[in-house]
Every structure is written in structure tokens, then in C-alpha cells.
Amino acid sequence: MSVNLDGKLVVAISSRALFDFEEENRVFEDGLAHGLPPGVKPDAAYMKLQLDRLDVPAKPGVAFSLIKKLLAFNEAPDSLQEAQQPAKPAQRVEVVILSRNDPVSGMRVFRSAQHYGLNIQRGTFNRGEPPWRYLKPLHANLFLSAHLSDVRSALEAGVPAAQVYPQSARASQEHPHEVRIAFDGDAVLFSDEAERVYQAQGLSAFQAHEADKAQQPLLGGPFKPLLEALHRLQQAGTSRMRIRTALVTARSAPAHERAIRTLMNWNVEVDEAMFLGGLAKGEFLREFEPDFFFDDQTGHVHSAAQHVPAGHVASGVSNSGGV
């Protein structure tokens, strides 16, 4: 019988999103920028550096905490009763490396994962080629990458995706048994319908539009499928691992009601909702301490990245060429 990933939360992630390869990446970029003798490939110095460091575990990257905690759902028993029995826990989460790295450098990625106890067994290493096309056969629920072009392509293919900011602050260690994820609303969880009104007509028109349509659910945005998948994982429950989600939005009353009613219509719950009315999100996120935050506007992502791991969802009207 063939193996498949049906029923799992599938996260595809690039090596730079999972591990801190920024020093190595600078060597790679230097190879591309400078002329090389005939026959010398631009990634030769990079490959040599990665091979020389094969036994040196890479430092955790911006999405490391998120991945480590999600994988812990595979180790956590479903209930206290199961925790007292030697039964194999359900395998609910699959993490797959999708990398522009070469296969030789891929050895260090897998070895680093093994060092940290991350049970990651699958990956593709495409030596400079975009890896996003492999998201479809994986049926991925999330793709994290440092390459904006790959993120855009994934979003166009209907996969929730975000460009990680490698220099983001790292996640808090205060919640070892709880995955904390924060989402922006418009153009992330929801469609950009309301955001288009705001950008075209201003705040007053936006508030009036949303108050008028409070009973009409918003269409889903690019991250609705991920929120639903996390909700299913949350509902399954374990005796050890939990998920806590937050909606962190620039909306304020009366526009809050349509957002809440939309989630109710989807039969999906979030644990916290912050209606900030344009206040900077960063300090609120610092207090929530998420393992990751997703937003469609780079200004909000930069604000967040000073305090928590953050990623840019290049979708909607706020992003030139967005979907």
C-alpha cells in the first residue's frame, strides 16, 4: 500500500526559514555577484562551506519554534488514559523541507534537524530552482520561505504561504506545550473586500461598509484553510500539546462584528481577538508571545518582527501583484 499524508497537517518549509543560514546565504549571494573562472559554478564556495560544516548543527531559525511545537503533536498522547498505555501516538503533523539548496547542502539540513530532535524525513533540494511546485502533490497546508517569489507563486496556487523575515525576534520559551499563532484579518484570514473599500474611500467609508454588512460573512482569504486545519488539530486535543490562536487586526468597532460573525459562520474559533484600530501591533504581539504572526502589510510585519517571529503574506490589494 502506498504512503500518503491524508489527514495530516502538512507544513512545507525552506531551510532558511527553519534554520539560521544567513551567514551561509551571504556566501552564496557573493558567488552569484562576482565573476568566476570558467567551469566554476557560482554555488561552489557555498557547497564547500556547507559540507565543511556538516557536523556543525545550524542555529534555530525564525520558524524553528513553530515547527518544533507542531511536531510535538506527533509525540503527545491523545488523553491521560493513553498517556498511561504504551500505545503509539497518532501522527497528525508532517513537516517537509522544500529548499533551493543543493542536495549536498541538504545533508546538513537533515543532520541539523536530527540534532534538535525534529522528526523530519522528507524534503526536496532543487539547487536554485523554485521548489513551490511540489506543494501540490504534498497538499500542503502552509509554506514558509525566505523567497518572496516562491511565496507569491504558492499563494497563486492556493497554498497558504508567507515570506519569513529571518532577522525577526525569536519566539518566547514561556509556553512549551502550546503552539501560539496570530493572524491578521483582512487579506489574510479574510478576503481583501473590506481593505479595498478602505484604500479607495477611507476609514469612514470602511466603517460604514462593514457595519452595513455585519451579518454578511466575508469570503475566505489565503489563510482560511490553515486556520481550519489548526482548528481540527486543536479539536482533536492531546493531554500535552495545545493550540492557541489570535486574530490581531487594525479593525475597530463597529467593524469588529463582521469579523467575529464570519468566524462563527465558518464554525471556527479563535482564542483571542485584538481590534486595535490602527495601533502598532508589535507590542501587543510581544505580550501574546506567538510562535508566528502572519500579516499582509509589510509595515505591520516589521513592527511585529521586533518582538516575535513574523511573516509577510503577499496577497490582496496592499501588495503589488498580490493575489
Model regions: which residues?
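Alpha-helical substrate-recognition element adjacent to the catalytic core
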Residues: 2-129, 175, 184-275
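Asp-based, Mg2+/Mn2+-dependent phosphohydrolase catalytic module
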Residues: 2-9, 19, 148-181, 185-212, ...
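Short beta-strand/turn micro-motifs composed of small residues
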Residues: 15, 99, 145, 249, ...
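Conserved acidic residues
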Residues: 121, 141, 179, 271, ...
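Short hydrophobic/charged patches on amphipathic alpha-helices used for structural packing
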Residues: 132-133, 282
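Short acidic-hydrophobic, aromatic-tinged amphipathic segments that line or gate anion-handling sites
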Residues: 122-127, 145, 162-164, 273-277, ...
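Short, structured coil segments at secondary-structure junctions
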Residues: 116-119, 138-139, 157-158, 266-269, ...
